[in-house]
Amino acid sequence: MSNESLANLLKEERRFAPPADLAANANVTAEAYEQAKADRLGFWAEQARRLTWATEPTETLDWSNPPFAKWFKDGKLNVAYNCVDRHVEAGHGDRVAIHFEGEPGDSRAITYAELKDEVSKAANALTELGVQKGDRVAVYLPMIPEAVVAMLACARIGAAHSVVFGGFSADAIAARIKDADAKLVITADGGYRRGKPSALKPAVDDAVSRGDGVEKVLVVRRTGQEVAWTEGRDVWWHEITAKQSAEHTPEAFDAEHPLFILYTSGTTGKPKGILHTSGGYLTQTSYTHHAVFDLKPETDVYWCTADIGWVTGHSYITYGPLSNGATQVMYEGTPDTPHQGRFWEIVQKYGVTILYTAPTAIRTFMKWGDDIPAKFDLSSLRVLGSVGEPINPEAWIWYRKHIGGDRTPIVDTWWQTETGAMMISPLPGVTETKPGSAQRPLPGISATVVDDEAREVPNGGGGYLVLTEPWPSMLRTIWGDDQRFLDTYWSRFEGKYFAGDGAKKDEDGDIWLLGRVDDVMLVSGHNISTTEVESALVSHPSVAEAAVVGAADETTGQAIVAFVILRGTANAEDDNLVADLRNHVGTTLGPIAKPKRILPVAELPKTRSGKIMRRLLRDVAENRALGDVTTLTDSSVMDLIQSKLPAAPSED
């Protein structure tokens, strides 16, 4: 970005007060902000006491060697005990922990007592296979209960898990196994996806064959499909766990004992292994899940639609909800199998009260039409959440109206793999929400927006999002590469964590996320956020989803190029539509933000976690050979876009 701050073009006037009954009974009230402001470390010490410690910590934060934080360092706990055993001991063994819904329609309910037995058996099995405290275990599984059991079993014995998303290639698995030096891999024959079995083990076999570090491969039977078998290395999960005792005494580990490594794609070079540890991570994931969703474990049914391969699945399927004794839904498959109402059918079936999903899913549901959710009873819902990227205001309003019946608060949560837990979000019983804004840092979190010179921007100004004080669930380093950790996150602004996201403050001082800094366009000397232009396009009734990039332009430096997916009724061949869309952006944001080219497309290139790969669209817009497409869900999407773009009309 240039020295001029990020343009603040989008004005949002709509406001939604918290429902009175929710506010009256909220887990967390406005007092929490004051309490945390008065004594931040005392506040986090109090949240740590929500957990069960074998040795209570006496020191909250050791920041003697910044940016390497140690939280609750003299405390000891077992993360799996906190997620399972303590609820059984408190008399909640019969409460359902997981309502599993398989894509083919099979389902099973697992109580906390059953989960404790499953985790104990798996922990005993891992020990029998030679896994010890401090070892690393790679996990490559579909969205089945064994994925959660495997993670908790690792945590129980003090082995760090490295979960690899079940859609990644053998190359990606091999790189992650090698970097973490994993000695065991847990996988499955396959999982169900889009109505048919999708094999997982072949990719593991390929990845493991490339190195000599992996001693055993533990295989869950899910689909029953044929698998290649390596005698002496491969072990069936059901066979080894069946013969284990359901008794396992969990050992207490230091609060700073590694809990997991989770790889996130670097913009360049090899993936970054984000290291999270035990005490601080569990303190913040547990507290934020309790606070932001207002979870009442006796009555709520919670559903986070993420995959456990992403940090959202780690923090808000496995650790946060289970530490709070929640009952949750876990769904294996895709939202349109066997029909486009599958999610709403699940909400209706289990009486889901809290739903946490991503803007990319919400925009897809918008594209499919309002009539689909209308067929189902969604009246059980009381809190809706959004995660993964900034949510366009129109998608926010659609989500509230068509899924939330115009009554549910929406918590738009900003956080990252690196932050470990939610950082900026409304509180459902406190905040007057604004469509499209994550609003303000949660109690105990210090975040602001700064300009190029690290000066805090005034209200109405834009720049870079930074975190100014350490937080309990922060990443401790990049696995095996402290220097890269320093260079990536701490070198840009001295003493501040740089998130890599653009942001603005509105006139009230609330924070709006504007996407990755790489997604800011410099048009005729103005910094314009792709997020704002995309939101303007999506606010047009004909547009379901939009991706915007800046392409090199001789006249303006960069020109705005937009790729749009139209709603069902709109016609891509309508010549007036492109002009109409261009004018709509001009009216909404100002003439400077009008796209030079707009191309209607059937699909957009997305990563497996649903994020739009704007980098590839930029390659197309600038007539370059495509960069790395290995994380794309469907690479044929790009061939179509490449063939169509040259013919797209351009505004002179």
UniProtKB/Swiss-Prot annotation:
Q: Which residues bind CoA?
A: 193-196, 312, 524
What is catalyzed by this enzyme?
Answer: acetate + ATP + CoA = acetyl-CoA + AMP + diphosphate
Which cofactor is essential here? Mg(2+)
A molecular function annotated in GO for this UniProt entry is: metal ion binding
Q: Which residues bind ATP?
A: 388-390, 412-417, 501, 516
Annotated keywords: Acetylation, ATP-binding, Ligase, Magnesium, Metal-binding, Nucleotide-binding
Which GO terms of type biological process are on file? acetyl-CoA biosynthetic process from acetate
One Pfam assignment: ACAS_N
Of which family is this protein a member? Answer: Belongs to the ATP-dependent AMP-binding enzyme family.
Its name, as the record gives it, is Acetyl-coenzyme A synthetase
Annotated organism of origin: Streptomyces avermitilis (strain ATCC 31267 / DSM 46492 / JCM 5070 / NBRC 14893 / NCIMB 12804 / NRRL 8165 / MA-4680)
